Design a protein with these regions (language model features):
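FabD-like malonyl-/acyl-CoA
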Residues: 1-144, 271-300
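Alpha/beta catalytic cores of group-transfer enzymes, especially the acyltransferase/condensing modules
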Residues: 10-11, 38, 103-252
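Short amphipathic alpha-helical interaction segments
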Residues: 248-256, 272-273, 277
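A short, well-structured juxtamembrane/interface segment
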Residues: 255-263
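Non-catalytic positions within long, well-ordered alpha-helices that form the structural scaffold/packing
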Residues: 265-268
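Short, charged, surface-exposed secondary-structure boundary motifs
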Residues: 303-305
Length: 305
């Protein structure tokens, strides 16, 4: 049994998907649709840069979605991707929107609009330079929760991504995250401050969640096929209204990726296929369970392999 995975922010790079764009009309049509929806040429930024524009979160989010949907459609229409043995789709953060589009729950037009708005809302939720994120390596989530409890009584310092057994990302107020980093150094633990423009997936994003509420609730969804794993509950959700509510909650909640992967394995998944730029999720799955098969498709060459 297989699960298909779609990456989140941080996997983007200028020129991603260019080989698919050059060769397949279906990809050109997807790019044109996204450009028309957003009323500017996101495709030009994806293919040509500049990198600074691609890294703007309101551009990054729909861009990564467009690449994932493009590659998925090429695999389905030109390489006979067998979906009969696919039990789940799962996406990391914004990747959940890619999963919903590929699962037929959401149109690409609406996903592009929502992700562009989501990016703007998340960036505007906290003044620039007031928030930060740190990746902590080599500690269990229980150890990290004890560590951040020292700082989180009066300040915002929360787990944003539970990525694997040995990688957890913490989000919060910049001064507090810097203090946490110093504390980790004193204890000879490894923390990496992330080059992000806002502290995603924590309660500092409350304003963004409020701003997205009506936009998501007013969007027409249909039940996806196959089922989509929610970042918030770490299991499949089929009720449309609950899916909408969880997409809103996701903005301020931790991404429960480790639990999601373990849940899919418990449900019989033995083969994971990552579709989209980079190999981040493939690396995380390997850290979670070395006994499953993992492959990644980011280029036409990957398909040939």
């Amino acid at each position: 049994m297989r699960a298909v995975l779609f990456p989140g922010q941080g996997s983007q790079y200028v020129g991603m998907g260019s080989d698919f764009y050059d060769k397949f009309d279906v990809v050109k049509k997807i790019f044109e649709t996204v450009d028309k929806t957003l009323d500017f040429s996101l495709s030009h930024i994806i293919l040509n840069g500049p990198e600074a524009k691609l890294k703007l979160t309101q551009n990054t989010q729909p861009a990564i979605m467009a690449i994932g949907v493009s590659i998925f459609n090429v695999l389905k229409n030109h390489f006979d991707l067998n979906l009969k043995n696919v039990k789940f789709f799962a996406g990391h953060s914004l990747g959940e929107y890619t999963a919903l589009v590929c699962g037929g729950a959401l149109t690409i037009e609406r996903a592009a609009y929502l992700l562009n708005e989501r990016g703007k809302s998340m960036q505007d939720s906290v003044p620039f330079g007031k928030g930060a994120m740190i990746a902590i390596l080599g500690m269990t989530i229980e150890e990290i929760e004890k560590e951040i409890n020292i700082f989180s009584k009066k300040n915002i310092c929360e787990i944003a991504n539970d990525n694997s057994n040995t990688q957890v990302v913490v989000s919060g107020e910049k001064k507090i995250i810097e203090n946490l980093n110093e504390n980790l150094k004193r204890k000879k633990k490894k923390g990496i401050l992330l080059p992000v423009s806002a502290p995603f997936h924590c309660s500092l994003m409350t304003k963004a969640a409020e701003n997205m509420k009506d936009k998501i609730y007013n969007t027409n969804f249909v039940r996806p096929k196959p089922n989509i794993i929610s970042n918030v509950t770490a299991k499949e959700e089929t009720d449309i209204n609950k899916i909408k509510t969880l997409l809103i909650d996701q903005i301020t909640s931790r991404v429960r990726w480790r639990e999601s992967v373990n849940y899919m394995i418990e449900q019989g998944v033995t083969d994971f296929l990552e579709i989209g730029p980079g190999k981040v999720l493939s690396g995380l799955v390997k850290k979670i369970n070395r006994n499953v098969k993992i492959s990644n498709i980011n280029s036409i060459e990957d398909i040939k392999e």
